[in-house]
Amino acid sequence: MTDHALLLVNLGSPASTQVADVRSYLNQFLMDPYVIDLPWPVRRLLVSLILIKRPEQSAHAYASIWWDEGSPLVVLSKRLQQAMKKEWSHGPVELAMRYGEPSIETVLTRLSEQGFKKVTLAPLYPQFADSTVTTVIEEAKRVVRAKSLKMQFSVLQPFYDQPEYLSALVESVRPHLEQPYDHLLLSFHGLPERHLHKLDPTGKHCLKDDCCMTAPAEVLATCYRAQCIQSAATFAKRMGIPDGKWSVSFQSRLGRAKWIEPYTEARLDELAAQGVKRLLVMCPAFVADCIETLEEIGDRGAEQFKEAGGEELVLVPCLNDDPNWAKELNRLCERAPLML
């Protein structure tokens, strides 16, 4: 049967490096209540203030990593889409972005017009967060309601602990770890601490004690920090990396609110001060390279590390369109449960 579509969803990107396009993208992204979880008037005021200077700064950053084909995130996601077409045997493989184009609404509407009633929705985020997984699911729900679409959805669950994801990660990173290095830093995207507090169903664990490696299942299911740390520890164990030669940090802090720690910026300085000369950095919260990996870590992070006394920061590429990753992702999508 070929009546079951697969919809891969990633974060998105500005249409170009022009300031106006970056401003439009940032406005859509930051006004999402799952990203900045403040009341609408406060969120609107805060985003308006951010948009005074941030678009020009971000446009410069995007321009520094933009490819001839376009945004690296979009280009790499399209390449993964093509690789997945060789694996997914049940119907078409489509790609949408939560922010920017092609939008979830555009793609779901087209699939409905083509007669597809079964869709596997695949948010390409290994760990769970409201600002990634939940917002994709809720946007799909909104489109279905607004357009009165007759569709059934299976939804790919967070896969930070799944053998398929870990196997793909190990095989992708292995060649880099075969070269001499002093330390491996696993830098995950950060989140405001309040995002974790509000999702702790017990109200007793997240960020109140050091439970990330021992969190009960009900807490672990929605605790982003615990999922990051557990996946990092499992990866390090599978690679045989001794304790002390790897660590975890969190990047991309925005605003003055307290975010989960340790911060990547601080960790880079600490490692250089500890005598680390050749530092490997991988970013396992991302399955495709993007501005947060290429510019924030590969460019600015490398410069900061050298200024602090390090010699070389090597950015390990994300999974991107690796054929082995496509095979493993297909296995994950095959068993996605029916949810909507």
From Swiss-Prot:
Sequence intervals crossing the membrane: none
Gene, per the UniProt record: hemH
Function: Catalyzes the ferrous insertion into protoporphyrin IX.
Gene Ontology MF annotations: ferrochelatase activity; metal ion binding
Subcellular location: Cytoplasm
Name recorded for this polypeptide: Ferrochelatase
GO cellular component, one term: cytoplasm
EC assignment: 4.98.1.1
